[in-house]
Amino acid sequence: MIVERVEEYLDRIEKINKDINALIEVKPEKVLEEAKKLEKDEKAKKKPLYGKIIVVKANINVEGYTISCASKTLENYIAPYDATVIEKIKENGGLIIGIANMDEFACGSSGETSYFGPTKNPRAKDRIPGGSSSGSAAAVSADLCDMALGSDTGGSIRNPASHCGVVGFKPSYGVVSRYGLCDLAMSFDQIGPLTKTAEDALLLTNIIKGKDLRDTTTVETKPFEKKDIKGFKVGVVKEFMDVADEKIRDKVEKAIEVFKDLGCEIVELSYKYVDLALPTYYLINYVEFFSSTRRYDGRRYGYKIEEVCGEEVLRRIMIGSMISQKEYSGKYYKNALKARNLMRNEMIKIMKDVDIIVGATVPKLPHKLGEKLTPMEMYSYDVLTVPANICGLCAGVVPCGDINGIPVGLQIQGKPFEDEKVLSAMIAFEKAME
């Protein structure tokens, strides 16, 4: 049964992946051998992920697979160990079928900056799939797997989930171990699921979460359960609504009516620091990314990153290098850290009396594949997703319709460590939309 399912998925990958470029490494013999072992293991049948076929973003270590981060820098580097999340997946009966494409070193929100070529959006082939977890979202959307892992630094799970019409979830900072993740910005990064249903997002989050001594930011949390959301106070932030295009705003307003029908109370909120989101996020991102890339010096892991990387990666390294210097760090980086505290404190304050916040995931529809955007135009896609990373919130995306065939995702955000509420709201909304 499991072997048969793996073979079916391998056939689909063979037929479809050439076109959409969602996966950059597949080892049929390896996954079939693991499937045969799993099928013979009677005890494994009781495991929660038994036989689930999973794709993993190319910045997460899976032993024996290349961990390239979709860059020439690491194109020949084979992961020597499993990341904590991969250990947990394997322990619970999951099968890794392949490695997903992504924006190079997670620098991008379009899926176009990969050394291995851009990923196409299975739901709108002339449009970007979003990024940086482009391949993970596209693989789930094109039914090349049951579920996938991505990472989210400023929207990198939620952005492609919205564009590709799938479910994505960024757990609260500290819920999931990042041991074995090649970080973009360590104070923002979280690993999370991309799935076909919100129930599956809950399932996979429960498997991968938990305290890990190898990641000191992690905390132990009780298993997340599906709760009744009747009576929830649902916040709607005026400034978040104002940023979104009119057509996307219409979809969100219809989604708000669904929550009313589910017995929720709608509460209007105001957040005065929306304008600080992008500069705060990117200044911290640049500095942390520059710091994390110093290991790619051409002596230990592969090529020297500055000599072979793409334009966006080089831009971030150069800016990060500049603002890390003593004469600039006080002017830019330290001010960004102050702004981060302002944003976080204000967010916690406005969320005090609500259970969740709902709104748009991205302010506009995905642009056309190959369309030239300035860096600021590209960064603007992140304006509604970066606040969750800056403030340590949990945040998920669930499909809420489409505009001319292009999917639109509803973003649901919750207070730190109230992941259960967000996942419950995602499940309830998805069921109401069926």
UniProtKB/Swiss-Prot annotation:
GO molecular function per UniProt: ATP binding; glutaminyl-tRNA synthase (glutamine-hydrolyzing) activity
Enzyme class: ligase
Record field: catalytic activity: L-glutamyl-tRNA(Gln) + L-glutamine + ATP + H2O = L-glutaminyl-tRNA(Gln) + L-glutamate + ADP + phosphate + H(+)
Cellular component per GO, a single term: glutamyl-tRNA(Gln) amidotransferase complex
InterPro entries in the cross-refs: Amidase (IPR000120), Amidase_CS (IPR020556), Amidase_dom (IPR023631), AS_sf (IPR036928), GatA (IPR004412)
Record flagged with keyword Nucleotide-binding: yes
SUPFAM superfamilies the UniProt entry points to: Amidase signature (AS) enzymes
Membrane-crossing residue ranges in chain numbering: none
BP GO annotations: translation
Annotated PROSITE patterns: AMIDASES
Keyword presence, Transmembrane: no
Catalytic residues (UniProt): K57, S132, S156
Disulphide bonds in the chain: none
Keyword annotations of the record: ATP-binding, Ligase, Nucleotide-binding, Protein biosynthesis
EC nos: 6.3.5.7
Complex formation: Heterotrimer of A, B and C subunits.
Record-linked HAMAP family: GatA
Homology family: Belongs to the amidase family. GatA subfamily.
Job of this protein: Allows the formation of correctly charged Gln-tRNA(Gln) through the transamidation of misacylated Glu-tRNA(Gln) in organisms which lack glutaminyl-tRNA synthetase. The reaction takes place in the presence of glutamine and ATP through an activated gamma-phospho-Glu-tRNA(Gln).
Protein name (record): Glutamyl-tRNA(Gln) amidotransferase subunit A
Source organism: Methanocaldococcus jannaschii (strain ATCC 43067 / DSM 2661 / JAL-1 / JCM 10045 / NBRC 100440) (Methanococcus jannaschii)
Taxonomic path: Archaea, Methanobacteriati, Methanobacteriota, Methanomada group, Methanococci
